[in-house]
Amino acid sequence: MLAVLIAHAAIALLAPLLFTRFGRSAFYVIAAVPAASFIWVLLQGGAAHSGQWQQVIPWLPTMDLAIALRTDSLAWVMSLIVLGIGALVLAYCARYFSEDSPDTGSFGAQLVAFAGAMYGLVVADDLLLLFIFWEITTVLSFLLIGYARVRLSARRASMQALIITTAGGLTMLVGVILLGQSAGTYRISELVAMGPQLASHGPIIDVAIALLLVGAVTKSALIPFHFWLPEAMAAPTPVSAYLHAASMVKAGVYLVARLAPGYSDTAAWQPMLLTLGVGTMVFGGWVAMRQYDLKLLLAYGTVSQLGFMILVLSVGTPDAALAGMALLVGHALFKATLFLTVGIIDHETGTRDIRKLSEVGRQMPVLLVVAIIAAASMAGVPPFGGFVAKEAVLGTLLHDVQADTGDALAWIRLLGVILGSVFTVVYSARFVWGAFGVKRSAFAQLPTGEDGRPMRTPAHHAARSFVAPAVVLTVLTIVYGFVPGPVEHSLLPWVGEFAGEATLHLALWHGINGALLISLGIIALGLLMHANRRTLAAVLHSLPHMTPAERIYREVIDSLDKLAVWVTGKTQRGSLSFYLSVILITAIVVPVTVLFLYETPPLGSMRIADSWGQLVAAALIIGACLAVLRAGKRFLAVLLVSVTGYGLALTFALQGAPDLALTQTL
């Protein structure tokens, strides 16, 4: 595990030199590192499933910080996603960028470094180490989103992502410290095992978990922090395909999955994650249905799906855990595929606006098939991986409702998932139609031909190596649908950490049951809504576009900017005497104030002076200082300042420190 981290760090340092030598083909070279790491991790599956694959290297013993790495079944699955999709995206970059694209060396270095940091995050077995990798991914995402730094939108989006995720990370750090100090350990494996026993520590554990969850929901773009993710679509498409579909935004989901076996019964867990999960799934799907930009459509769809995953994993049962992770695997495959598809369309046609795209499918038939399969998987259409995962979720939630425990939360989860899934079908159909369909003149913003119909969008031929990564992910989506058993088998050791026994099995066909009927109803209703897209569009666009959270964020940022201007105007006056006065007043007032706040000495015990000589020296210093303020000439002021120095030397001498007095005099 440590070797994988070192390899990614090393290739990131060498990347600029490789790009200087090989040009954009260097993406293939650096892609070899996550690809080789993927193969190596894949071969270690047996050790991961047994829970014996771990490394512990002392780092800062005084801070109880060690490089503790551990790959269990959950981390193993996440590692394969991070490394495998990372390698494919890097290979995709070799055709996405041209030879004259600027800063490809630094971009490649940052992207492969991000893959290494994300791998470190999922294998970290120390909360403090996990936080370090967490923040590394934040910084690298800031750099990657702001790749096109000459554009204001890219700079603004990168700064917004940095502010939101950093604020969540700092909140999470407080939770990390509270939990670690309360438990007496920062080892994640030990903390999860101790979860039920830590409940006796009182509300401190509930507060710690709530703070950790704040970090998770900001990283995974749940409401009200969702708006940074759509704004981050200013990044190059490979960044969106990797960070915002398969890795970074999954960090919060992973943290919830990691903590769920031990802390799903804490006070803040269910209310917080249920509310945010359902709200995010429904809201994200609702907004996705009215997007014209293909990347924004996928971005809001990702927000919706992240809420879906958090909602399912928060249930805290073995079946829900398995279904939630099955959903995560399926989402990583189809969403990365769709982002790569958008990148190809944008690259070959020059636009992502569905109003300017028409008949692209006839010119790119392979890409059309890829997009249909991936979108169908996203919508939960059989026989693809997304259907297997979604039916598993519906079956689990339906079972909870039918258990007749009187739990209203079970009904809220099920109804929220059904509504959000209908929206998912709608925006999935909108994606395929918008990217590849034939547009009518009433909708399209295209030049018209002699017959009055919009002309088709001209598209260049996409190289096979450009389309290949999307094809590979599509094949995996199909295989996952027909053969989900390996994913289930891989996750069972982690699922066994939950209380209770897992009864769910991932399969393409469970017979005709309630979950299947609900799935078919969702698909039918979603397609019906898409067929009436004009009416739907009229309803959607009648609503405000900016959410209250985004408005509040912008108002806060604007207020901070105004405050900074005001403070600067008050303090930066160009006057040296003013600056010195502020420094001296602060240096005197603050320590004295703190002294009297914490320990006020009795007035009777205070001594003004030990001798008359000290009073004379003090009077000399004070008098010289006052005279400096009244001095009209600089030379006289310098002489008076020297008098204060001699007065201080006299004080040292009277206190029995002739060496200090001599030093001060000289």
Provide a role label for each language-model segment.
Residues L88-G105, A109-L130, V139-G449, P458, ...:
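Hydrophobic transmembrane alpha-helices and their helix-loop junctions in integral membrane proteins
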Residues L2-A3, L13-A109, L178-H201, D206, ...:
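Transmembrane helix-loop-helix hairpins at membrane boundaries of multipass inner-membrane proteins
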Residues V4-R21, V217, A221, M281:
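N-terminal signal-anchor/start-transfer transmembrane helix
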